[in-house]
């Protein structure tokens, strides 16, 4: 079976690099175009990335000799789908241009997330939200990831919401520096320090999960009906977002019921046996000092959400710690899993 031709937009950035790594020898998709800024256009990817590749494995052989172009659908006419790791300053218009040209977009940027016709897709959590794509007027459809911080949080909340109902959630994030992209946070700001503010993060963390965890009725996504309060902090960890979560339930569960709901959780990616689908989706660790980025980040090749430290909360009901890989499960990996789901469900033609 021939593979679907795809492009990577923002190919030189941190998320773009993850796309290129994860798409190497992919059974469904063939990367035929790499797109970046005018500064890189006209050069081969290997030439541009000689000193800029920041992933421990080597640049995949398929990518080295591809000539970079600017992100213009006229230059990538043969592709069916584009993965976007573009900066939000340019992503909105560029992604819309691709959709207008009939090329599907799976975006990691914030620009289209709150459009009522665009799903914030988390493949195990809300595959039913794909129904709203028919409301988009363009031939090419736009699908987005959530913010990387709340990806693991949303996965942790989904089975709890379904079984016990949720009234309110408090989040306290400790976000890795790779989440700021490259070159990222200045060394003098982050070494030996915690920065208690990340522009726009708290607003996204308080609203995106409600859309992601909502239900589709009459072709529209109805947001979940609980409240979220978030504190977001940048910490001197390279990869991995750790979030402390406290939850007030409509029907308070026991510790055993919560753990059981996490261990039993799976979704369409697991049922369909998608290449990047983690098994388990959630791993609960009993050790009192886990999860830790250094020890747990690569669980399930970076796609498994790791949870620990479940204990009673004296103000709400229960509290726990959730860890997810921000550039894999929270970005490129989630987007690729979404694309695999679209492929298997024949949304890509």
UniProtKB/Swiss-Prot annotation:
CDD domains assigned: ASADH_C_arch_fung_like, ScASADH_like_N
Pfam families, A to Z: Semialdhyde_dh, Semialdhyde_dhC
**Which superkingdom does the taxonomy of this entry point to?**
Bacteria
The residues that the entry says bind NADP(+) are 12-15, 39-40, 178-179, 326-327
Catalytic activity annotation: L-aspartate 4-semialdehyde + phosphate + NADP(+) = 4-phospho-L-aspartate + NADPH + H(+)
Entry GO MF terms = aspartate-semialdehyde dehydrogenase activity; NAD binding; NADP binding; protein dimerization activity
Active-site residues annotated for this sequence: 148, 241
Q: In which pathway does it act?
A: Amino-acid biosynthesis; L-lysine biosynthesis via DAP pathway; (S)-tetrahydrodipicolinate from L-aspartate: step 2/4; Amino-acid biosynthesis; L-methionine biosynthesis via de novo pathway; L-homoserine from L-aspartate: step 2/3; Amino-acid biosynthesis; L-threonine biosynthesis; L-threonine from L-aspartate: step 2/5
Q: Which residues hold phosphate?
A: 113, 204
Q: What class of enzyme is it?
A: oxidoreductase
Q: List the SMART domains.
A: Semialdhyde_dh (SM00859)
In which residues is substrate bound?
175, 201, 234
Listed GO biological process terms = 'de novo' L-methionine biosynthetic process; diaminopimelate biosynthetic process; lysine biosynthetic process via diaminopimelate; methionine biosynthetic process; threonine biosynthetic process
Q: Which InterPro entries match?
A: ASADH-related, Asp-semialdehyde_DH_CS, Asp_semi-ald_DH_pep-lack, Asp_semialdehyde_DH, NAD(P)-bd_dom_sf, Semialdehyde_DH_NAD-bd, Semialdhyde_DH_dimer_dom
Q: Which UniProt keywords apply?
A: Amino-acid biosynthesis, Diaminopimelate biosynthesis, Lysine biosynthesis, Methionine biosynthesis, NADP, Oxidoreductase, Threonine biosynthesis
Q: What is its EC number?
A: 1.2.1.11
What the entry lists under SUPFAM superfamilies is as follows: Glyceraldehyde-3-phosphate dehydrogenase-like, C-terminal domain, NAD(P)-binding Rossmann-fold domains
Q: How does it assemble?
A: Homodimer.
Family, according to the entry, reads as follows: Belongs to the aspartate-semialdehyde dehydrogenase family.
User: What PANTHER family does the annotation carry?
Assistant: ASPARTATE-SEMIALDEHYDE DEHYDROGENASE
Q: What does this protein do?
A: Catalyzes the NADPH-dependent formation of L-aspartate-semialdehyde (L-ASA) by the reductive dephosphorylation of L-aspartyl-4-phosphate.
Protein name in UniProt: Aspartate-semialdehyde dehydrogenase
Organism listed in the record = Leptospira interrogans serogroup Icterohaemorrhagiae serovar Lai (strain 56601)
Traced from the root, the source organism's taxonomic lineage reads: Bacteria, Pseudomonadati, Spirochaetota, Spirochaetia, Leptospirales
